[in-house]
């Protein structure tokens, strides 16, 4: 399932469920056709975690190489990402832009193949696959169209042969320490809030004990070092140019936030970061001068989400961290979208979208359309949104300042 095609219609109800379908399908194939080792090639939101879950379940020699991110687009002289197409719809309904600009976004926001261009869910998970140690360096960030991506694929194919010879299996790498390294990286790069759901599911398949408390504690202890699109105008290609995930982990190691003794598909994590550039200070900040002292995600709980919720705090404006507003409640995504586009929502409102959870949706669909509409209407610094559904990694109402809270339990 491509989440970009499943947005704002009944197809999004199938998206999260497809993760389990992917995992189960791989189990069927690997059980029916016994293989000595597996090369996984994921590149969209649910495919990445679904494949990692399958790797843990089957526990064979395994290695990942993603298809790679796309390059950012360019519209009206500005670099843009996929999310801005949806924001343009809000601008169009507001009369801010006309047909010609909307068509420009449609034609040019996604100029190449690849898993979008920002720190959305697919790229977040590809980066965390690298942080866990299941892929070679740069697998999470090397652009899909670069020649280096082809060389990376060849290197991955050579490496799986060695993993088979050494009988290094998936669960030798998907350990508690590796998963905690991934959580630290998650917080440092300001990744998608969907990573909370996926890392918990991966840990469950691998028999690793990780809880929401572990995630929240890791966030409180880990500084955010990078802030990428949709929360800024920095893209995955920019992160790749300054060293990628290995440089992020290298900086985290200097601050004592990761364990570099852990095993990966290519030596220890210490071996991998030894060759990585140091943090450049602009795209990858240092631990001494972080974007924020705690992580990009936070776990919240209260009377609306007794079992927990997640907020992408690293993309919230300081003035929106304490927000009181008028609740306007909608029974479903479409009703909320209609209200936003028809100017029912005004500054100071809290949009509450309910009955979009795992059972209510069903399928816990993403709320990209309403969040993008909020941005397009210019309300992202004055309106909050709470839902029992999920938020797309491409949502940047939080990036513009609005508060987005999605339930995870």
Go through the PLM ranges and name each one:
Residues 1-66, 356:
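Long, structured ligand/cofactor-binding scaffold of large enzymes
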Residues 10-11, 15, 48, 54-59, ...:
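Catalytic or ion-coupling anion/metal-binding cores of large enzyme and transporter domains
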